[in-house]
Amino acid sequence: MKHILFTLKSCPYGLLDDEAHTRNVLVHAAHLCKSTLLGLSSHKFDPQGVTAVALLAESHISIHTWPEEGMAVCDVFTCGDHTIPEAGVQYMYEMFGATDMVSQEFVRPLR
């Protein structure tokens, strides 16, 4: 099981404040992780910001955006030898136009 926590920095306001874009990115990130998407939930805040969670058979992907700060706090958590969480992280970095990222990866033991 891999759990990658990451912060996307210096992202354009418009991408971070777009709920449809955020949902689309999570769907495609799940596919790139080789995971099975079970559900997707999101909320658009007023005046800005989006929170979204993709429920995966293998765990989850989440994002919480702060457009006014140019920042998104995210995680990709997958289990199974077939998954590639790094691919989802890279895709999210690219699709939110980040110019910097801080990340930390945890390998969670089963026992």
Model-predicted segments: where are they?
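Polybasic/polar functional segments that serve as interface/processing modules
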Residues: M1-R111
